[in-house]
Amino acid sequence: MSGGAQSPFLFKCSSQSAPRWAKSNGSESQPISVRLHILFFLTILFAVGCNKPLPLPSLSPSNKSSEDVKTETIAVDRLGRTIRFTEVPQRIVSLSPSTTELLYAIGAGNQLVGATEHCNYPPAATRLTRVGGGTLQGISRETILSLNPDLILCKWDSHQPLIEPFERFKVPIMAVCPDTLAELYEEAVLLGRATGHELEAHDLIEKMKRRVLALTSWVDSVPMEKRRRAFYEVWDEPLMTAGPKSFIGEMLELGGMKNIFADATVRYPRISDEVVLDRDPQIILAPSTHRSQLSLEILAKRQGWDRITAVRERQVFLIDGDQVSRCGPRMLDALEEMIRAVYPDKLANVLEKEPIDSKSVRVGDSNEDANR
């Protein structure tokens, strides 16, 4: 070796390295053939020694090869529970449609083996093994276990009783399901890391942020006093709406509307007809997948509702029930539907994406898509 730093893991070759017994004693009486044999032996010895790493046992953490060493991934779910993975999950069961859609959106759809009966998007999700309905009572634990899952994704707010039973079977279970746009971004990263698709998750987030900006860039130019009062009917019996802490309430605000229940302290409060009448919304929005599909006739039959501005002016709109009811990537499609229905002139020049086919339906108008 010549020039540069010497490697500490290699023998250093020099004339001083030769054993004393191997050196010539200067005697001319030794036969030439003997000296040649000794010289040949030393040449071979030093050639091997100079190319053999110095064994340092203290620097070797184990006898395992680098391929045997597994990296541990740590995830913290919505309940603050820590879940550790030494391998990327390949047999995932999702108990929420929004979670299922998010997994497909980040490229982890082929790692799913089971989902609920309500997981209907994308179409590939309908081919997964059904593990029951979305409610706690409707979920089949036996079916889930038969799929030999290495990860179960449940709802943090309604599936908590499932956690302990599956933990007893040593099945990792994470409590997820966001309820704001910011939480959706966080969950995309969480699931991206857990499934080995973190880069795709960040890419999805950036695309969603750009689209939100494109859809809402005009909102700040509308004075608060000119924004339309909106009521979103989550359910009819009992009458429920969306508060500001819910992603639906967030969409109303992003879409330039004033939620008449912006003072609600819970996500989906029960309300009375009298309060709705008193706050007199200019816009009424509801999911198309209502228990009984909303119509002007139904609203007008409610006591006093025929006096509400939105009913009198026929400003009642149905929004795609799946998109508007799931805090997932398609919630931005629902946001666009809302804006197109309420402020139809605002999106003409601001969208960065190809416009979707709007599925919002003005209640009372003739439109076969109302039953989609």
Task: Put a short name on every predicted segment.
Residues 37-48:
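Bacterial N-terminal signal peptides
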Residues 51-53:
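Bacterial signal peptide processing site
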Residues 72, 91-157, 162, 260, ...:
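A short, structured surface patch at a secondary-structure boundary
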Residues 72, 82, 161-240, 261-263, ...:
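Extracytoplasmic substrate-binding proteins
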Residues 139-148, 168-169, 271-280:
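Short helices/loops that flank or line small-molecule/ion binding pockets
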Residues 244-268, 288, 317-318:
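His/Asp/Glu-enriched short active-site or ligand-binding loop at hydrolase and phosphoryl-transfer sites
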